[in-house]
Amino acid sequence: MYGALDISTSGLIAQRTRLESITANIVNKDTITDASGRNNPYQRRVVFFSPGDPTATTPEGKALGVHVSSIEEEPGFEARYEPSNPYADDKGYVKYPAINPAYEQINAYEAQRAYEANIVSAEATKTMMAQALRLIA
């Protein structure tokens, strides 16, 4: 029964990580410089999952749930014509992050719904465990 809680917990952690990445993408959609001040736009980050959480295993050693396998930067930028911008190149273009706020918002809703589904699953498991304890006691 605890395996079900481990699975839900791994899903909560994975979706929280995904939502943090989406939030960072939205916040940095207009970040056009790197730490050194050069026109090097923020790169969109994408979270990838893999089945099985190495920290949650059955007695047989089988991994349960899900885990974040990687967080990768998606290369690319959007060139905008802004000749008066101090970061413009010789042709007057400035590199901006290739981030679509509407797409990120849809991903955020999806992550939120998956997070909520994991909470419901954990609550159902908790209720089942409480009922089983009442039967035993």
List the predicted regions and their residue ranges.
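Amphipathic alpha-helical polymerization modules
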Residues: 1-137
